[in-house]
């Protein structure tokens, strides 16, 4: 079976493959981030979102892989074979789990549409010959505001004032979104 864990989220393994392996933070940092930002929702018996569910599954899979690595370390007699198995788990399986964790944490943090826009932007940037592309890759947290998903029913803010209207001298106040619910 060819199962793509990103398909239902509008992405694909191929789309994430444009990001180099050293782009993704280490597992410990990703797990700490997930815990710091989404612990309550991840531990809740309530269903919050498909991203929360996928994040839970990735965390559980990593735990099981660590159990396997520990078992192999304890039970495989040959040190060279033991090292090969542990290395394979850390490098190959670890990368897949790091990609999954990064994707779902990013979708929960920035919004799915923003993350997909970032993946497409990065894919275009990396495939553009060096002579023709900007020196710096796109950065997820600095994507233009136009990629931010807005709630339905609200019209988007105007980007520039009309020529007849003068801009106020006082800074605009932004509405702060309440973080009452973690979901």
Curated annotation (Swiss-Prot):
Any single GO CC term annotated in Swiss-Prot or TrEMBL for this entry: T=4 icosahedral viral capsid
Main location: virion
Disulfide feature: none
Sequence repeats: 155-161, 162-169, 170-177
Entry keyword annotation includes DNA-binding: yes
Gene Ontology molecular function, alphabetical: DNA binding; RNA binding; structural molecule activity
UniProt short sequence motif Bipartite nuclear localization signal, positions renumbered to this chain: 158-175
GO BP: microtubule-dependent intracellular transport of viral material towards nucleus; symbiont entry into host cell; viral penetration into host nucleus
Coiled-coil regions listed in the entry: none
Modifications after synthesis and translation: Phosphorylated by host SRPK1, SRPK2, and maybe protein kinase C or GAPDH. Phosphorylation is critical for pregenomic RNA packaging. Protein kinase C phosphorylation is stimulated by HBx protein and may play a role in transport of the viral genome to the nucleus at the late step during the viral replication cycle.
Region (RNA binding): 177-183
Segments for region (Disordered): 143-183
SUPFAM superfamilies, per the entry: Hepatitis B viral capsid (hbcag)
Entry superkingdom: Viruses
Keyword Membrane: no
Keyword terms of this UniProt record: Capsid protein, Cytoplasmic inwards viral transport, DNA-binding, Host cytoplasm, Host-virus interaction, Microtubular inwards viral transport, Phosphoprotein, Repeat, RNA-binding, T=4 icosahedral capsid protein, Viral penetration into host nucleus, Virion, Virus entry into host cell
Modification type Phosphoserine: residues: 155, 162, 170
InterPro entries per record: Hepatitis_core (IPR002006), Viral_capsid_core_dom_sf_HBV (IPR036459)
Region of interest (3 X 8 AA repeats of S-P-R-R-R-[PR]-S-Q), residue spans: 155-177
Pfam short name (any one): Hepatitis_core
Similarity-based family: Belongs to the orthohepadnavirus core antigen family.
Function text: Self assembles to form an icosahedral capsid. Most capsids appear to be large particles with an icosahedral symmetry of T=4 and consist of 240 copies of capsid protein, though a fraction forms smaller T=3 particles consisting of 180 capsid proteins. Entering capsids are transported along microtubules to the nucleus. Phosphorylation of the capsid is thought to induce exposure of nuclear localization signal in the C-terminal portion of the capsid protein that allows binding to the nuclear pore complex via the importin (karyopherin-) alpha and beta.
Oligomer status and interactors: Homodimerizes, then multimerizes. Interacts with cytosol exposed regions of viral L glycoprotein present in the reticulum-to-Golgi compartment. Interacts with human FLNB. Phosphorylated form interacts with host importin alpha; this interaction depends on the exposure of the NLS, which itself depends upon genome maturation and/or phosphorylation of the capsid protein. Interacts with host NUP153.
HAMAP family: HBV_HBEAG
Name the UniProt record assigns to this protein: Capsid protein
């Amino acid at each position: 079976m060819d199962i793509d864990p990103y398909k239902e989220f509008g992405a694909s393994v191929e789309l994430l493959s444009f990001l180099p392996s050293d782009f993704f933070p280490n597992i410990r940092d990703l797990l700490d981030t997930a815990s710091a930002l989404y612990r309550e929702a991840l531990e809740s018996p309530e269903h919050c979102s498909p991203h929360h569910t996928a994040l839970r599954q990735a965390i559980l899979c990593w735990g099981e892989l660590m159990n396997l690595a520990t078992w192999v370390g304890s039970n495989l007699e040959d040190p060279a074979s033991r090292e090969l198995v542990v290395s394979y788990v850390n490098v190959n399986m670890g990368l897949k789990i790091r990609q999954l964790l990064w994707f779902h944490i990013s979708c929960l943090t920035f919004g799915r549409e923003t993350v997909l826009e970032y993946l497409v932007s990065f894919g275009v940037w990396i495939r553009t010959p060096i002579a023709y592309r900007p020196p710096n890759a796109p950065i997820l947290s600095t994507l233009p505001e136009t990629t931010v998903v807005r709630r339905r029913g609200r019209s988007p803010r105007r980007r520039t004032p009309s020529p007849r209207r003068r801009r106020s001298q006082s800074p605009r106040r932004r509405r702060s979104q309440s973080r009452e619910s973690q979901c």
